[in-house]
């Protein structure tokens, strides 16, 4: 009943009878390559309840004809898990960064007469490959910079894991949910062409492994990196990262804790205790 009421309200136009949208009008920013000119193409596909943006893109892929009747190459886009786990389908949808697989048309579309209007653009903080596909390599390169792994130099008996405080374990779990989708980098004003800041995702992973009983072996190396130009000082505390993170990762808390840890590390290093 609530859904019907919402549609009725959004469908009212100057006293006319309310109109339930029957189609989706997608405006897609297209670009054949990073050195090519970009342009907009508009497609219309039939609307079905509970459709997501990926479903609409699949409809276009099956019949790549624009609203004006022109047959074109199907727009390029990425998807894998379709359950908001891989991050491959991340794009700007009606001006907001999120995953296309969980973006329901009823939620993100703007009702306009008999159509839901949806605008799709690629992420702007990553090199463009084609249309809605970008190269997220720098996220994985940043993980290398913070040494986002547990160092293992041989084979060991499994045995019992080292006990860990339950609060730390729960915090580590929240940090481990990162899927390197790029939402936080896209929303962060400090991540730009003029800055070398590694971004919130890599910093969160640095803390994740610093809190690991074995990963802690590389804590000094990670803190040393984070005290440099690419690290903690690059954060401007805009807090956009936690607003857009699809996994609600406490990124600002991670940055704050590492800010404390790097300060203690530098003081100890200055006093020769490191």
Where are these regions (language model features)?
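A basic, amphipathic helix-loop patch mediating RNA/tRNA/ribosome contacts
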Residues: 60-96
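Short, thiol/selenol-centered motifs that function as redox-active sites or metal-ligating centers
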Residues: 26, 86-89, 100, 178-181, ...
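Short, contiguous acidic and Ser/Thr-rich linear segments
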Residues: 40-52
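N-terminal mitochondrial targeting presequence
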Residues: 1-19
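Eukaryote-biased recognition of intrinsically disordered, low-complexity regulatory segments
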Residues: 21-43
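A generic, well-ordered mixed alpha/beta core segment in the N-terminal half of proteins
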Residues: 86-139
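Ferredoxin-type iron-sulfur electron-transfer modules in oxidoreductases and energy-metabolism complexes
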Residues: 51-73, 116-274
